[in-house]
Each structure stands twice: as structure tokens, then as C-alpha cells.
């Protein structure tokens, strides 16, 4: 038996001990945990190369993908190669990596990984098990999305081997996407792909019968097949065609497999594990015609630089479907007993919900019975900034859909503030609510809510023991007080002596004369024409005093005096 210390398995953060014996090899983490074993009959090939923590032994297994053991010393090569030759009958191949730094080369599709070679030396390899999705990003460009770490919160011990073939304990920074530019055309042969002026990437003959196609398309199709992203990812239990998705926007076919489901669109394809579904909502729309199925994903769905933490489907309530599951009776009775039925014949939204629930094991969350809107619906129409949507009130949370999908847990809510923005007439018909979160976690504002929904919202938040701050009553009192002040000012003006003569300076500052009720189209005629008859309640003399520019402020001045001052004002105005 050969033993090696401080060896890292599959990019783990924690080292362990690796042991080789005639029956196979094993690895146990130093801090304790599950032991990984590999039977000798499952070892297909082995490669030795320089790596991050010293030297790496890469084992290509017959059924378990790629196993990476890093941390060996250079002197360990002789012991390892001798043990593999005697016990397993395998020669350990010593490989040197390409260190030129070139970003162009040849792609090689091996049994378990995609290798990128520069001058016939590997620059890097990507195991197929690490590829979550691939898309045609352009005519000659293929995007490859990589799986995120199994447990981003680090709840599992470092070095865990429960998810073979995936990163056991990755660091905080990860590579999530790569893009390959593949120009020109290529020929797909029986044994591989041959470029226009290049040798075959997978070797073999028979290119005479091959059909010349776009090289990027062939690369994409072969990667889909190797990484088991497409139809070859096991047996399809059920398929739903042309389902409308609001987030991400488009129509997708849904293929449901044993451990994952796939969304197939015209431009993008997505492969999503059921284990990524953290929340499952069934939300009826206010139009009584459609319903929404919302899936909360962690890690979120990615489309380039855009993340979609929620998947939102919209389905018609009256659309019936007849579906028979593509599943053996034995599998249905053992693994999915009381979870799935062999045949469904009911509305499509119920069928999709039941199959998703059966395969993922997630509980379906529906709107709370404690809330009914003014019009008898489960959702309230509102908007986040310029995006309109529906806000649903659940037993333990709030959710706004479709875009941007926003999820708020009740336990994190500190206070809900109801307010009216601005003093426009429309503000009296609508109001806003601001949900402030505890511990400075921020706030969410929902705008343009119908005024009739105020009472149902207040009753719901009170039932959930959430503090409510109503700023609308303060705004209403302020508006009423301002209106009363305006009425007092108008009545005092009409009485004549209620307001003192403020002089011409104050008259110039007036933007609107609310007491003006003249039949004439000219303000100047009312102010200066002595023959003009006011429609107000006071006498001509009182109106003249009120219109005086303040040249003579003596209260005993008669009307003749006022008339003598008027020509001066006219000549002053004309300058």
C-alpha cells in the first residue's frame, strides 16, 4: 500500500490522505468526513502534470468522470507510476501544460472533459460535469456557463465528496462563463469534427461523407451532447410546449428530467437542477384568466451578465391538457409514490405545478387567506419605479412580480409607511407604501396603489402584527388647512377692508389674482380705467383704493387724489 499526505481532492480547501492499494484508491479529509473510494476496475487512464499546489494526478475513470488529486511532490511520480503499472495495468502519462498565454488553439472533446490545446499541449480543461449550460451567443460565438459551487454558504465541510464530479468547496471567486470564438465552417464526421483547413479534433476518418456546416453550430451541438444538456440528459418524464415566460421574457419548451429540467427557446437554452429551486409560488392574476407559476432559484439563472433569481411563467386558466408521464410503473411506485400520477387530464397550470412539486419536493406557496383586495383579488396592482406588476400578500412574505421580481419576508419588515407623493389631483386616487426592513437592510417602495386598497392593506398588516405608519392623514390635514386659509383670504378680499393696502411691490409678486372676476380681457383696464365697473362687492372708491400703487398712503386721501396719481403710473409703465 502506498500513502500520501496533504493531498487535495477536486479543488477542495481541506487536505487529506490518499492511499493506493491493489483493490483501488481512497481519500479521507484530515478534519474528518466522508471517504472517497475508487475501485481499480473503474480507473481508465491517469495523467501527471504540474498544478496549483505542486503536482497533480488526474484520473479518468470509466464511470465517475474526472478525479483530480493535487499536492504531490515531484519525487512521488516514481512511486505512483509503479503502483499504477503493477496494480492497475495503467501507464501514468506525464503531460506539460501550454504556458505561452495564447488565447487561440484547438478544442478537443474527450470522454469526460473539454480540453483547449495550444500547440498540442493542454492550456486548460473543463470537465463536462462543471458545464451547466451553453448557448449560441452569436454567429461565430459560443457561450459556456459553468456550474456554481455546490454550497455557496459553506454549510458543508470543506472537502466534502457527496457531489462527485463537482467542485467540492470552491472559493468566493469563481469562473462562471467562458466564450469561444469559432469562425469558418467545419465537417462533422462519424468520429469527430474536422475544420475547413485543420485536422480533426477527435480524429477518425470518413469526412468525405460529412456535411459542411457552421463551425460554431457544430461545436455547440457536440458540447450539448457531451455535457448532457440537451435531449440526451436521461429520459424525459414530461414535456410542455411553448410556455410563455415573463422572466426571462420569451416562450420556452419545458423538458422535465429526473434531477433537472430544461428550458428550450429559439435563442437560449437553460438547464436547471431541481435542487436550485428554493421557493415555489402559484399566484392567480387579477384578470381571472391567467395564473402565474413562480420559481425562486439559488443560484439564479444567468443570461450573459443578467441574473434572474425568479422564473415567472404565465398560463391560461382554461387551457386543458392530457399528459401521460414517460415513467416506468416500477419507478412510479417506488420513488414517486404519492407524489406523481401516471396520467393527468386537467388545466395545464395544475399539471405543471403537480409535476414540479413531485420531482422537486418543494411545497407550493399560495396567497394568504387573510388578504382580499377591494375587488376580491389576491394581488394588488402597483409599480416599482416604472415597472408595473402585482404585489401578492402571502402568509409569511410579500412578492412582487413579474419584473423586477421582489421577495420580502415578513420577519424582516420593521415598518410599513403609507404615503401620498406630491399634491396633484391624481395623488388623491393613489398612494404608495414603503416597506422598511430591519437592521438597515434597506427598503422597498411600491407606488400607484389604488386608494380603495388602503383599508384591506391596513387590516392585513395589523393581522400580521406589522407596525404601520400612515402619513396620508397628515397630508390630508395639511391640504384641508391650506384650503381653509385660501377661503379666508378670498372672503376678506371680497369684504374690502379686511386686508391692508400692501403697495405695488406686493402686487408685482402676485402670480395669480384669485379674486379677479372681470368681464374684460385686460388686467390694465380693470386697474387703470376709471370708467370700469368692478364686479366685486365694494364701491368704486374702495376698488380705487385697493388698486392704488401706494404713492400716497394717507387714509384720508379722496378719490380725486387717486385719479391724479394714475397718469404718473401710466407714464411709468410705458418707459
Curated annotation (Swiss-Prot):
UniProt main location, coarse: nucleus
Gene3D superfamilies named in the record: 2.30.29.150, Pleckstrin-homology domain (PH domain)/Phosphotyrosine-binding domain (PTB), Structure-specific recognition protein (SSRP1)
GO MF annotation terms: DNA binding; histone binding; nucleosome binding
Cell compartment(s), UniProt: Nucleus; Chromosome
Any single biological process term in GO: pericentric heterochromatin formation
InterPro entries in the record: PH-like_dom_sf (IPR011993), RTT106/SPT16-like_middle_dom (IPR013719), RTT106/SSRP1_HistChap/FACT (IPR050454), SSRP1-like_PH1 (IPR048993), SSRP1/POB3 (IPR000969), SSRP1/POB3_N (IPR035417), SSRP1_DD (IPR024954), SSRP1_sf (IPR038167)
CDD domains recorded: PH1_SSRP1-like (cd13230), PH2_SSRP1-like (cd13231), PH_TFIIH (cd13229)
Region feature (Disordered): 148-169, 191-211, 484-575
GO CC terms: chromosome, telomeric region; FACT complex
UniProt entry keywords in alphabetical sequence: Chromosome, DNA damage, DNA repair, DNA replication, Nucleus, Transcription, Transcription regulation
Comment field (misc): In contrast to the orthologous protein in animals and plants, this protein does not contain a HMG box DNA-binding domain. This function may instead be provided by the HMG box of the associated nhp6 protein in the FACT complex of fungi.
Similarity annotation: Belongs to the SSRP1 family.
Annotated protein name in UniProt: FACT complex subunit pob3
Annotated source species: Emericella nidulans (strain FGSC A4 / ATCC 38163 / CBS 112.46 / NRRL 194 / M139) (Aspergillus nidulans)
Lineage of source species: Eukaryota, Fungi, Dikarya, Ascomycota, Pezizomycotina
Amino acid at each position: 500500500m502506498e500513502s500520501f499526505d496533504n493531498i487535495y481532492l477536486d479543488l477542495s480547501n481541506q487536505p487529506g490522505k490518499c492511499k493506493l492499494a491493489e483493490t483501488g484508491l481512497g481519500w479521507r479529509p484530515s478534519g474528518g468526513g466522508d471517504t472517497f473510494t475508487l475501485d481499480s476496475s473503474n480507473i481508465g487512464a491517469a495523467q501527471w502534470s504540474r498544478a496549483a499546489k505542486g503536482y497533480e494526478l488526474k484520473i479518468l475513470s470509466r464511470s465517475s468522470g474526472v478525479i483530480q488529486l493535487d499536492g504531490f511532490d515531484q519525487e512521488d511520480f516514481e512511486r505512483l507510476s509503479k503502483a499504477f503499472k503493477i496494480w492497475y495495468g495503467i501507464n501514468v502519462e506525464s503531460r506539460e501544460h501550454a504556458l505561452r498565454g495564447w488565447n487561440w488553439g484547438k478544442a478537443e472533446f474527450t470522454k469526460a472533459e473539454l480540453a483547449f490545446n495550444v500547440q498540442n499541449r493542454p492550456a486548460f480543461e473543463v470537465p463536462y460535469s462543471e458545464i451547466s449550460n451553453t448557448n449560441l451567443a452569436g454567429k461565430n460565438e459560443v457561450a459556456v456557463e459553468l456550474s456554481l459551487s455546490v454550497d455557496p454558504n459553506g454549510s458543508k465541510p470543506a472537502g466534502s465528496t457527496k457531489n462527485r464530479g463537482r467542485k467540492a468547496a470552491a472559493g468566493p471567486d469563481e469562473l462562471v462563463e467562458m466564450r469561444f470564438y469559432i469562425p469558418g465552417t467545419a465537417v462533422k464526421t462519424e468520429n469527430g469534427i474536422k475544420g475547413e483547413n485543420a485536422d480533426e479534433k477527435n480524429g477518425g476518418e470518413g469526412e468525405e461523407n460529412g456535411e459542411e456546416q457552421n463551425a460554431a453550430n457544430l461545436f455547440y451541438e457536440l458540447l450539448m451532447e457531451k455535457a448532457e444538456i440537451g435531449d440526451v440528459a436521461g429520459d424525459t418524464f414530461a414535456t410542455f410546449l411553448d410556455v410563455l415566460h415573463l422572466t426571462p421574457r420569451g416562450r420556452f419548451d419545458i423538458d422535465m428530467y429526473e434531477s433537472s429540467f430544461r428550458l428550450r427557446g429559439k435563442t437560449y437554452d437553460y438547464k436547471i437542477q431541481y435542487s436550485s429551486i428554493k421557493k415555489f409560488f402559484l399566484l392567480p392574476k387579477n384578470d381571472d384568466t391567467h395564473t402565474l407559476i413562480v420559481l425562486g432559484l439559488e443560484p439564479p439563472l444567468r443570461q450573459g451578465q443578467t441574473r434572474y433569481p425568479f422564473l415567472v411563467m404565465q398560463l391560461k386558466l382554461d387551457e386543458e391538457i392530457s399528459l401521460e408521464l414517460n415513467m416506468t410503473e416500477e419507478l412510479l411506485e417506488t420513488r414517486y409514490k404519492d407524489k406523481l400520477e401516471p396520467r393527468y387530464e386537467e388545466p395545464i397550470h395544475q399539471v405543471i405545478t403537480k409535476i414540479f412539486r413531485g420531482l422537486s419536493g418543494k411545497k407550493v406557496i399560495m396567497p394568504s387567506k387573510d388578504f382580499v383586495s377591494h375587488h376580491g383579488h389576491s394581488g394588488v396592482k402597483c409599480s416599482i419605479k416604472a415597472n408595473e406588476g402585482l404585489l401578492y400578500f402571502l402568509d409569511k412574505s410579500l412578492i412582487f412580480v413579474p419584473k423586477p421580481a421582489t421577495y420580502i419576508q415578513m420577519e424582516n419588515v420593521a415598518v410599513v409607511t403609507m404615503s401620498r407623493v406630491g399634491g396633484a389631483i391624481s395623488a388623491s386616487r393613489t398612494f404608495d407604501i414603503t416597506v422598511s426592513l430591519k437592521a438597515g437592510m434597506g427598503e422597498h417602495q411600491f407606488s400607484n396603489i389604488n386608494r380603495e386598497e388602503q383599508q384591506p392593506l391596513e387590516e392585513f398588516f395589523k393581522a400580521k402584527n406589522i407596525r404601520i405608519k400612515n402619513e396620508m392623514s397628515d397630508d390630508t390635514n395639511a391640504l384641508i388647512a391650506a384650503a381653509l386659509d385660501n377661503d379666508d383670504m378670498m372672503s376678506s378680499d371680497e369684504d374690502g377692508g379686511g386686508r391692508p393696502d400692501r403697495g405695488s411691490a406686493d402686487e408685482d409678486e402676485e402670480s395669480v389674482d384669485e379674486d379677479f372676476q372681470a368681464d374684460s380681457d385686460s388686467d390694465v383696464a380693470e386697474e387703470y380705467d376709471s370708467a370700469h365697473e368692478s364686479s366685486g362687492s365694494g364701491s368704486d372708491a374702495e376698488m380705487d383704493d385697493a388698486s392704488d400703487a401706494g404713492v400716497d398712503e394717507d387714509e384720508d386721501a379722496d378719490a380725486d387724489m387717486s385719479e391724479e396719481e394714475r397718469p404718473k403710473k401710466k407714464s411709468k409703465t410705458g418707459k
